[in-house]
């Protein structure tokens, strides 16, 4: 059976109800596993992959206990943490640094999982009106980070899974809070992710 490895933040991993700003989200990983049961083994980073530099720091540790050389597809996202404004500050990762970090994460993926095809997922939109002021994201900035990610992936010849456009069509019932998705939203994301991963396997 083929092996798929998912890298991503709490949109993938899920987010428990730990604060007034987060009402609990299952994450899409479990539904990708459900969708591809019997077709592919779906593995994932054992924690929230957060921002690109965090992924770069911990990816080697995350892949120590998996058959890394046998991974066939890596579906990867970083971006929402990078574009996050905390406590009225600038985005966590300056956009030029974000581009550099994406290239470095890609190189690390290629080194650790050399036989895998890589797919990059664009970051999803937020409900701006519900964003807490201490942890704020602007969709226009998410779009700009996605634009830069697309440029980097074009340079690296990595296909892009446009989850931003998909989720732009979601109403509030698809969201668990201002950023994370409900089961309905996670299942919708998982459907497209499973489809894109299977296309990569068959390419």
State the predicted function of each range:
Residues 1-48, 53, 61-69, 74, ...:
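Serine-esterase "nucleophile elbow" of acetyl-processing enzymes
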Residues 6-11, 36, 44-51, 72-93, ...:
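Cell-envelope and extracellular/periplasmic
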Residues 41-43, 117, 157-159:
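Conserved beta-strand segments of alpha/beta enzyme cores
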Residues 59, 102-106, 146, 150:
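Generic structural signal for well-ordered alpha-helices
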Residues 65-70, 112-113, 200:
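Glycine-rich phosphate-binding loop signature in dinucleotide/nucleotide-binding domains
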Residues 77-83, 106-143:
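Active-site segments of SGNH/GDSL-like serine hydrolases
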Residues 91-103, 141-146:
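Charged helix-capping and loop-helix junction motifs
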Residues 123-203:
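Catalytic His-Asp segment of secreted/periplasmic serine-dependent ester chemistry enzymes
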């Amino acid at each position: 059976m083929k092996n798929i490895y998912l890298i991503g933040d709490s949109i993938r991993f899920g987010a428990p109800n730990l604060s007034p700003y987060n009402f609990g989200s299952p994450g899409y990983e479990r539904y990708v596993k459900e969708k591809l049961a019997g077709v592919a083994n779906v593995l994932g980073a054992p924690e929230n992959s957060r921002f690109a530099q965090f992924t770069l720091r911990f990816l080697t540790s995350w892949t120590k206990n998996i058959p890394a050389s046998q991974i066939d597809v890596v579906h990867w996202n970083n971006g929402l943490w990078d574009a996050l404004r905390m406590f009225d500050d600038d985005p966590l990762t300056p956009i030029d640094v974000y581009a550099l970090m994406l290239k470095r994460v890609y190189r690390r993926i290629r080194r650790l999982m050399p036989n895998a095809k890589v797919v990059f997922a664009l970051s999803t939109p937020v409900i701006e009106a519900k964003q807490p002021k201490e942890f704020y994201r602007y969709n226009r900035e998410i779009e700009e980070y996605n634009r830069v990610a697309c440029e980097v992936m074009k340079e690296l010849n990595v296909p892009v899974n446009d989850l931003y456009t998909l989720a732009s069509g979601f109403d509030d019932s698809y969201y668990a809070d201002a950023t994370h998705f409900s089961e309905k939203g996670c299942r919708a994301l998982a459907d497209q992710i499973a489809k894109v991963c299977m296309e990569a396997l068959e390419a």
